[in-house]
Amino acid sequence: MYLTIQALVLRVTDYNDRDALLTVLTRNYGKLTIKARGVRRKNSPLVAPCQLLSYGEFTVFEYRGMYTINEAHSLELFQGLRRDLQKLSLGTYFAQVAELVSQEDLPNPELLALTLNCLYALAKLDVPEQMVKAAFELRAACLAGYTPDLYGCHACGCPNPDRFDLAAGRLECMTCRSVDSDGIRMPVLPGTVDAMQYIVGCDTKRLFSFQIGDESARQLYQLAETYLVTQLERGFSTLDFYKSLIVDLV
């Protein structure tokens, strides 16, 4: 039986000298592994739709417990990413996070929409890279089950707390912190909290429709990254590479 899916390619792994295995994210089936036969051959029609960060339509069939591509065509290649190494490296970081957060055979349309919207923003919209990155990281943390509590100090209810507990994912006042508490706290400005509240709660299609001052933006960029890696308890090689490119350009 044939199955037609629309999917984003998150990872490409060589299988042999002719074939490759694709890790893809779908709307209705979650994360899947599919085999692309002959994709490594010269002039294969599967090259474009099967490349990393390609969004395409795939017709697959199941054989010996594995999905294999029968035919495929591209829906969006995000060419704006492929002409810019820095943007491409950030896109691959998004893909690595999405692969970790998603699960086999568990639908996650919100994660697919988030990743596609952020790739589109990098490729075609006039949105700062760091803003796209922070919005993706914070929203991905929510989809992974780590939605932060962003409405007042968790201890006293003060509406304007000035610290964010990275491990607990909540706001607090300096005076409410227990002297023997563990975890790292980062300072937050009201503008930073407002932006975080917007990112966590907005429609994905309007993810970048907010204003933020320069100092609050710098806080947001650092906090979103640190919060995601703290909650997922791991680093990302793609993130390290992206940051090395930024350092080289400074």
Where are these regions (language model features)?
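Non-catalytic alpha-helical scaffolds and adjoining flexible linkers that form interface surfaces
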Residues: M1-A20, L25-V250
